[in-house]
Amino acid sequence: MNKKFYITTLGCPKNTADSMSMHHSLLEEGFTPATFAEESDFHFINTCTFIQSATEETIQTILSAAQVKKQNHQKLVVVGCFAERYPDNISSEIPEVDLFFGTGRYAQAGKILREKFPDLSPPKREFNDSLLEKLKLSSEIENYSKPYAYVKVSDGCNRGCSFCIIPSFRGKFRESPVEDILRDVDRAIRAGAKEICLVSQDTVYYGRNSEVLLDMVRKVAEIDSLEVLRLLYLYPDKKTEKLLRLMGETPKIAPYLESPLQHVSSKILKSMNRVGESSTFKDLFALAREVKPGLEIRTSFIIGYPGEEPGDVDQVLRFIEETRPEKVNLFSYSPQEGTKGAELKQTVSEKEKSRRINLIRDVHLAILEEIHESRIGQTYDAIVDSVENDQAVVRRFQDAPEMDEVVYVDDISLIPGMIGKIRIDSFYEYDMNGTWISK
């Protein structure tokens, strides 16, 4: 009895890593991955509820899957952040959901499914460690064909930011043993990944002290078959400075800093329960560019937080104009029930939030156009992500997969995973066109 599963993943790269853990658990219990959701017996939706728009996308995805379920006689399984946060709502308002569980049980997904649906589960198969590893590896090769992979180094968060609901359902910070991280990296590389992205809610908190964090990163970078190592979500504190210096000493680490600042006004940062100030953030960005030539920066800001005034927005504008981060993500603040921020008087209207975001975006787009102009004729180390519609989709090492710019190349002879040099020829608002000049 061949029972197939399919996993739809919403949200951030951390969810992608969790879906892989769930994928492996289902393989261990004898379930088979489906190529399409419509042909699966069990459709899993790994959800996101970080902000209101993510929650709305999750609900719409579940409702759409519920319609498909009726036609295909599937079981619909909702997992992750939304299931952890709103279990009562799922039970009472979405009866089409056959099973749901939260963020701490991804690695038990196969056993949970077998216990809940014993009559619909495949026969239990016994694997020795070697055979199981081969099965997981071959499944990754078949189902995760991109030349990059996400490896999670921890879960949960101890920061206590007043706008963030994640600790309430992800829990306190828990790090993965170095041995587990190295195993996951090795498996991803053997499955074809050329680039490894280390992800977590708070990567720099790993090990609680700088040396443990640096030692973990060094061990990953020392893996001979690894081509590119990318570090994601670096909280802007003193440990990040030490990590940046290691990046400068380690050629394999991508010239890329992702550090979500969320704001630069000291007043708003204090209300958000975050550390740092505009001057320390400027120093951090300057250090990153000093120790890693060619490095590009991705950051984010939450606009419209309670108490934010025009002067606070001006500080964000001045910061962007002075530091010129290449990639800026802007979020409209949405109060999350159960957070300290939601208890504050909401002083900024939705219309005003949109106006402020548009103002900041226009300023950054003007800067980005100048940055794009400076890229014309320049060459960059790059990796081929895919070939589709008679074009290759290429990504500079300065750009992270799935969230940053790509370069389109009219060369279908390129192969996903190929690493070489690309010349930038022209640009759009965000993405670029280029020529592959080295194979």
Swiss-Prot record:
UniProt-recorded Gene Ontology molecular function terms: 4 iron, 4 sulfur cluster binding; aspartic acid methylthiotransferase activity; metal ion binding; protein methylthiotransferase activity
Single GO biological process annotation from the record: tRNA modification
Cofactor binding note: Binds 2 [4Fe-4S] clusters. One cluster is coordinated with 3 cysteines and an exchangeable S-adenosyl-L-methionine.
Gene Ontology CC: cytosol
Protein family according to the UniProt entry: Belongs to the methylthiotransferase family. RimO subfamily.
Reaction(s) catalysed by this chain's protein: L-aspartate(89)-[ribosomal protein uS12]-hydrogen + (sulfur carrier)-SH + AH2 + 2 S-adenosyl-L-methionine = 3-methylsulfanyl-L-aspartate(89)-[ribosomal protein uS12]-hydrogen + (sulfur carrier)-H + 5'-deoxyadenosine + L-methionine + A + S-adenosyl-L-homocysteine + 2 H(+)
Name of the featured protein: Ribosomal protein uS12 methylthiotransferase RimO
NCBIfam families the UniProt entry points to: 30S ribosomal protein S12 methylthiotransferase RimO, MiaB/RimO family radical SAM methylthiotransferase
Domain Radical SAM core: from-to ranges: 143-370
Localization annotation: Cytoplasm
Binding residues for [4Fe-4S] cluster 2: 157, 161, 164
